[in-house]
Amino acid sequence: MRYALGVEYDGSEFQGWQQLGEHGGPSVQASLQAALSSVADAPVQVVCAGRTDAGVHGECQVVHFDSDARREPRGWMLGTTARLPPSIAVRWCVPAADDFHARFSARARRYRYRLLNRQIRPALYRQTLSWERRPLDADAMHGAAQALLGENDFSAFRSVQCQALHARRHLQAIHVQRIGEVVEVQVQANAFLHHMVRNIVGSLILVGTGEQPADWIATLLAGRDRTVAGPTAPPQGLVFIGPLYPAEWHLPAEVTQ
């Protein structure tokens, strides 16, 4: 039987979502599979909606897995969470259709990037906030970011390690706002390239400080040259909010579009 899980995690202590072999360091995937396998009393493999890098967090990562073990969804949720480290929790578990796929059934994915904009670096929230000491104009950043909307070639915001076959993605929404001392960037797309969100944020910061004009983002997009764009923003400010699926899959409302 196939199940879908909603998983929350603090990525600070992990080398990323993906299990990278025996000597690849701790991963969220390996921890989750070990816990599920213990509950099932048999090996369990999971497939996720979107892989995250080292230090990046997940608010509602969605995974699917198959198991012949007879467990109620609540049993999977509570039993798995009890076997996970404190930095990972299963938020919900529901039965899924046999043809549901956490990655390929998703219609969109959402990320949030938050950075503390003040002279003094964060102490209390240093693992979940990035930091920029220079004053940022969030309105200018928001205006510049709108040039990225639509289906475009995002080569200028793609890491050199990216293994995607092409750089075309459909950016459905991007919003920048200031909330007190925090500048927040929320972005939604059909899919993302490796480091795409962090590279966009790194370039928007240069607009926010006034180092670059607002139309620079459009110029970068058209130029498709990663070497002239802004630096990659640090990982700790990034959260994978989660994917969105069509209602036909009958998943919880927070991941249904």
Curated annotation (Swiss-Prot):
Annotated S-S bridges: none
EC numbers: 5.4.99.12
UniProt-listed SUPFAM superfamilies: Pseudouridine synthase
Residues that, per the record, bind substrate: 111
One Pfam family per UniProt: PseudoU_synth_1
Top-tier EC class: isomerase
Reaction(s) this enzyme catalyzes, per UniProt: uridine(38/39/40) in tRNA = pseudouridine(38/39/40) in tRNA
Gene Ontology molecular function terms on file: RNA binding; tRNA pseudouridine(38-40) synthase activity
Keywords: Isomerase, tRNA processing
GO biological process, one term: tRNA pseudouridine synthesis
Active site per the UniProt annotation: 53 (nucleophile)
Function field: Formation of pseudouridine at positions 38, 39 and 40 in the anticodon stem and loop of transfer RNAs.
Family: Belongs to the tRNA pseudouridine synthase TruA family.
HAMAP family: TruA (MF_00171)
UniProt cross-references to PANTHER family, sorted A to Z: PSEUDOURIDYLATE SYNTHASE, TRNA PSEUDOURIDINE SYNTHASE-LIKE 1
Subunit structure: Homodimer.
Protein name: tRNA pseudouridine synthase A
UniProt source species: Xanthomonas axonopodis pv. citri (strain 306)
Gene it is expressed from: truA
